[in-house]
Amino acid sequence: EESPNHHSALYRSEMTEEWSCEDAVAAHVAAGFPVGRLVLGIPFYGHGTNEAPELLDYRHIIVLDSLQSCWDSAAQVPYMINSQGHVVVNYENAQSIAFKCQFLHQKGMLGAMYWDYDSDDEKGTLRHAVYQGVMNP
């Protein structure tokens, strides 16, 4: 099975789908939508392969002890690989959210939203990252 592509990459990389967040914002602005009215959506779930469910909540991703967390520095998002080095899950973490919030402030966007509350861990790691990133640029 093919490795899953990043579903919410901030920027393009070899592992992104057709669109990155940057591409989506640029397309909306090019179509005449005011950047100051745009809100960046941040998923609190990941996409997996046959070794993990296709959709996996962040709270379930962080307990996958058999996988190693990695970072795509071009796309600015994390992913997990198995012992053979194959990508198993693409997802968001506090670091990727911080980069997205920096981006939305640099672009002059209205803010961020996430989907969904219940997918976060018990500590609210991702919710707190969104709050800090949006409210404390």
Predicted regions and their residues:
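Hydrophobic faces of well-ordered beta-strands that scaffold small-molecule active sites
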Residues: 38-42, 110-115
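Non-catalytic positions within long, well-ordered alpha-helices that form the structural scaffold/packing
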Residues: 29, 105-108
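Glycan-binding loop/region signatures in secreted carbohydrate-active enzymes
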Residues: 37-103, 123, 128-137
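A short, acidic, flexible beta-alpha connecting loop/helix-capping segment that sits on the rim
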Residues: 116-123
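Substrate-binding surface in catalytic domains of secreted glycosidases
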Residues: 1-65
